[in-house]
């Protein structure tokens, strides 16, 4: 599965270190997520989807629809 996290980050001219800070993880670990060397934890996928304003499905490459799903509650 090809993640879109690198494209989303680069489209916003952000550095890996900046996104790693959002996730509260090390930059080298985040880099491994971008290169698909380690699986992206669901908690991080959810956090990144909220950060970028996209759905988790879009982030994971399962749909081409960027819009996030409406939140319940």
Task: Give the residues covered by each predicted segment.
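Short alpha-helical DNA-recognition segment
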Residues: 14-32
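A short, Lys/Arg-rich alpha-helix, primarily the initiator
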Residues: 1-11
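Residue-level detection of the helix-turn-helix DNA-binding "recognition helix"
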Residues: 10, 24, 35-37, 64
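DNA major-groove recognition helix of helix-turn-helix/homeodomain DNA-binding modules
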Residues: 24, 43-58
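Short, charged recognition helix plus adjacent turn
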Residues: 11, 50, 60-73
